[in-house]
Regions:
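C-terminal catalytic histidine-bearing segment of alpha/beta-hydrolase fold enzymes
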Residues: 43-133
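The feature captures the conserved acid-bearing segment of alpha/beta-hydrolase catalytic domains
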Residues: 1-54
C-alpha cells in the first residue's frame, strides 16, 4: 500500500501500481506517490479499477477489521530510517508510526475477483512493454 513509501531515489526501473477504486485501501495515496515519483523522473503507471475492491472484486464491502490505510489523505514519506514526513510536510516520528498512526479499524471483504483477469493482463502488458532485450 502507499500510505507509507520511500522518497524517490534514482532508479531506471519502471513501476506499476494497480488499485481498486472501492478498496479499503483507497487509490489517493498511490496517486500522490506516483506524482512525486514522476517529478523525480520515474516512469510510473497507476491503473485504477473503478468497480473493484482490494481483491479486484465487485462484491466487496467495508467491514470492521484492522488495516494500514489511515494516512490515505496525507501519506508518510520515508527519507531515511530516522526522518519521516507526511506529503504535506509534517514531521512524523517512528514511534508514532509504530503506535498506529496509519492504522484504522476498517477492513475489506468480498473475493469474487471479477477484475482479476484484467489486473493480470495489465501486469503482463506492463512487463512486455518494459522487457529488456
Amino acid at each position: 500500500d502507499c500510505n507509507t513509501f520511500w522518497a524517490p531515489s534514482l532508479s531506471q526501473t519502471p513501476m506499476l501500481i494497480m488499485k481498486g477504486q472501492e478498496s479499503h485501501y483507497p487509490p489517493k495515496p498511490c496517486e500522490i506517490m506516483a506524482n512525486l515519483y514522476r517529478k523525480s523522473g520515474y516512469e510510473i503507471s497507476v491503473k485504477i479499477f473503478p468497480k473493484s475492491n482490494h481483491y479486484f472484486s465487485h462484491s466487496g464491502r467495508i467491514v470492521k477489521g484492522k488495516a494500514y490505510n489511515g494516512c490515505s489523505d496525507d501519506p508518510v514519506i520515508i527519507y531515511n530510517l530516522r526522518e519521516f514526513k507526511t506529503a504535506s510536510g509534517v514531521s512524523v516520528s517512528l514511534d508514532e508510526l509504530r503506535k498506529g498512526k496509519c492504522f484504522t479499524p476498517t477492513g475489506g471483504s468480498g473475493k469474487t475477483r471479477e477484475d482479476l483477469d484484467a489486473a493480470i493482463e495489465t501486469a503482463l502488458d506492463f512487463f512486455d512493454k518494459h522487457r529488456t532485450p
